[in-house]
């Protein structure tokens, strides 16, 4: 079917967080910050090659939704290649049980095993707050696209070489 969906529970791949918040799926969730779980890799298997939309179900209670600039920003990689930014804005001060979805990133996956990585890269993933860049990740969601979109939402990321 054209609207297939896969859920990859984060806590099945990385030790779950010890926080005690409600509303998550599965058996828990993981914390990601600039120093904790800043490079997360999952292996996924899909039956057919094609376009997939990848997003993250997350919670971010670091501040109010309209100020403080404490969103968590990461770079999504698929099969070792940068695919686009993942943005997880704060959902309200101390709203750690308020779960929502990040922006979706379009990626081409091949039939069989693929790797998906969520990585904090400095300076490109720094937010305007400069200190707080953290979220709780419940799961990664893959949705099969039924056709290749005419407009690509995010251009490819080009990283400068460090000599």
Name what the model sees in each region.
Residues 1-163:
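Extracytoplasmic
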